[in-house]
């Protein structure tokens, strides 16, 4: 596979010319919107980028892509993104809200949102994947946040009621810390 890293619109991407895909690999620190002293309200991950007049679908967010970036309070991840790698948003202290619009694979026990102030998730995907994502957050000691009970999870209005009842309307346990977390589930998307 032939890949190249290119700078486009404030981000670096690793592109694959063969299948016209791109993985957001890191921020461009020279871009003024990512200065440490500036907090943006919203960061929208693009669904595509261009290189040499060719369009590339943004399909992933790389390992540590936004690590220790404090420039945004929320991130909106489009349907084109199908994976987020470990530590992608590690230590993003300003991050409070994540919108995940598609069927994203998030590796287990990899601290994608560790050491953030995440208090709200908007999840448009599969309910069972959401359950395992939340279970991973609660059971992973390194990413456990004491205020998870205060976290609100927004899901689609048309979500399967039986799946919601079976997977989300019960506490998730952290056996090592002897804790149970009951997320607030809101069907409003």
Model-derived segments and spans:
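N-terminal low-complexity, Pro/Thr/Ser-rich intrinsically disordered segments
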Residues: 1-9
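Structural signature of tandem-repeat unit edges
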Residues: 8, 12, 17-22, 31-60, ...
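Short beta-strand element of the conserved SAM-dependent methyltransferase core
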Residues: 24, 137-138, 144, 185
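An N-terminally focused, membrane-permeabilizing/fusogenic/translocator signature enriched
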Residues: 26-28, 64
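Short, aromatic/basic amphipathic alpha-helical patches
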Residues: 111, 133-142, 162-180
């Amino acid at each position: 596979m032939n890949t190249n890293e290119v700078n486009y619109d404030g981000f670096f991407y690793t592109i694959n010319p063969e299948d016209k895909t791109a993985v957001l690999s890191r921020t461009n620190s020279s871009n003024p919107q990512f200065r440490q002293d500036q907090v943006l309200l919203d960061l929208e991950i693009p669904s595509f980028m261009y290189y040499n007049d060719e369009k590339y679908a943004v399909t992933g967010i790389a390992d540590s892509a936004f690590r220790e970036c404090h420039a945004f309070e929320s991130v909106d991840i489009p349907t084109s993104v199908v994976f987020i790698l470990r530590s992608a948003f590690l230590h993003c202290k300003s991050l409070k809200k994540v919108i995940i619009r598609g069927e994203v694979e998030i590796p287990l026990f990899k601290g994608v949102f560790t050491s953030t102030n995440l208090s709200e998730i908007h999840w448009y995907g599969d309910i069972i994947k959401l359950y395992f994502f939340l279970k991973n957050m609660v059971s992973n000691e390194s990413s456990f946040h004491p205020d998870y009970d205060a976290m609100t999870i927004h899901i689609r209005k048309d979500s399967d009621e039986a799946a919601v009842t079976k997977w989300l309307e019960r506490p998730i346990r952290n056996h090592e810390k002897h804790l149970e977390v009951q997320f607030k589930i809101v069907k409003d998307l």
